[in-house]
A protein has these predicted regions:
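Short, Lys/Arg-enriched N-terminal segments with co-localized hydrophobic residues
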Residues: 5-26
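Short pre-active-site segment immediately N-terminal to redox-active cysteine/selenocysteine motifs
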Residues: 46, 52-56, 99
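Structural microenvironment flanking redox-active thiols in thiol-disulfide oxidoreductases
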Residues: 83-92
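A short beta-strand-turn-helix
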Residues: 29-48, 89
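Non-catalytic, surface beta->alpha helical segment in thiol-disulfide oxidoreductase systems
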Residues: 99, 104-136
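Conserved redox-active cysteine motifs that mediate thiol-disulfide chemistry
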Residues: 52-66
Length: 136
């Protein structure tokens, strides 16, 4: 029987080296886990995008570069997090995540919008712009 690896490589690199490794940016999106959820998402001010994903998920791998681009483009306006659902099934269950990738938007620790599936970048940008727009 194979032993389960407790953390993804990007999570380990981020924990030990921060968002850069050897001067190279590892990720624009911050890994989040059950243990850091309340601090990183629940108590975050402003808009937070959480990408619920898994290593084995093909569509998740397709949307990952788009999520990274959005994290760069909206740096300072949007906090982008990534949650591995295999490593953190409790959080995925808490928010009823049944399909991945699911991109869930939070404000004040509460979900405010959701996008399911590997959708085009424009759909995600439209959702972000709408959520960042001042209330009319």
């Amino acid at each position: 029987m194979w032993a389960r690896i407790p953390e993804s490589i990007d999570s380990i690199l981020y924990q030990h080296f921060g968002p850069t490794f050897g001067g190279i940016r590892v990720s624009n999106a911050t890994p989040v886990s059950s243990g850091t959820w309340d601090t990183e998402v629940g108590k975050a001010s402003g808009l937070v995008l959480v990408d619920f994903w898994a290593v084995w998920c093909g569509p998740c791998q397709m949307v990952a570069p788009v999520v990274e681009e959005l994290a760069s483009e909206y740096n300072g306006k949007l906090k982008v997090m990534k949650l591995n659902t295999d490593e953190n099934p409790d959080v995925a269950g808490r928010y009823g995540i049944m399909s991945i990738p699911t991109l869930l938007f939070f404000r004040g620790g509460q979900p405010v919008d959701k996008v399911v599936g590997a959708v085009p970048k424009k759909i995600l940008k439209d959702a972000i712009d709408r959520l960042l727009a001042p209330a009319a």
